[in-house]
């Protein structure tokens, strides 16, 4: 997933977001684009946050998520139609004091952050 960068901020409060996962060939849940394993639920997980690059200022390194459940479901429906899979959507929190890019992915408001906490499977 490549976020089209609009701005960066250090979060001053927790941000609720929604992340999609799909089953891998080995039956594990992974992120759909980078195939990163799904972190443990209810634990803050950190990763490297990439820098914007190229035309449109894409950001591909970090935890990508959607601002609304509706946008995450819309993206998961595309995966269901085109890749014959059954994605899950997880409600997450980008914790306070995280670094977070705000931008868009296929016209949907999205985030790319250096940390995330998975809360519950919601769709």
Q: For each of these PLM feature ranges, what is it?
A:
Residues 1-63, 67-123:
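Conserved NAD+-utilizing ADP-ribose enzyme module
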